[in-house]
Regions:
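Sec-dependent bacterial lipoprotein signal peptides
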Residues: 1-24
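Bacterial Sec signal peptide processing site at the extreme N-terminus
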Residues: 18-41
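Flexible helix-coil transition and linker loops at the boundaries of alpha-helical arrays
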Residues: 29-30, 63-72
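TPR/TPR-like alpha-solenoid helical repeat scaffolds
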Residues: 45, 109-122
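Helix-turn-helix repeat elements of alpha-solenoid scaffolds
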Residues: 47-61
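Structural register within alpha-helical repeat arrays
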Residues: 80-81
């Protein structure tokens, strides 16, 4: 009888310790800094949201925030910034953004090369 009570107590203690440790665990850090990016792309494609300049400023602020948190920008972020920069007539900055997207995500190389070729940047 004493052995059963002792085993039961041990089991309860292990379960309680597991619950406490699991409850204190931190959530995993997201792989990318998505804050506002998806909404911004939606507004851009919808066409009746904020102006390209306003959205560009918001996205550049998001990029700064991501750098401050040492978080990676999501796939397509730099490319979208580049498209906004093109719309604003900032061709050199757009080229730099497309090249940065190509470097960060090599799988986007074909599309970035296409956009760069359309710009005459080869």
């Amino acid at each position: 009888m004493t052995w059963r009570l002792s085993a039961w107590r041990g089991t309860v203690q292990v379960v309680a310790l597991t619950v406490v440790l699991t409850g204190c665990a931190q959530a995993p850090k997201p792989m990318y800094h998505w804050e506002g990016y998806q909404r911004g792309v939606y507004e851009f494609l919808k066409g009746d949201g904020i102006s390209a300049d306003e959205q560009l400023n918001q996205m550049l602020a998001q990029a700064e925030k991501a750098r401050g948190r040492d978080a990676a920008l999501p796939p397509g972020f730099r490319a979208h910034v580049g498209l906004l920069q093109l719309q604003a007539g900032r061709v050199d900055e757009a080229r730099d953004s497309f090249m940065a997207e190509k470097t960060a995500f090599p799988e986007a190389s074909h599309y970035m090369d296409f956009l760069l070729a359309k710009m005459g940047a080869g």
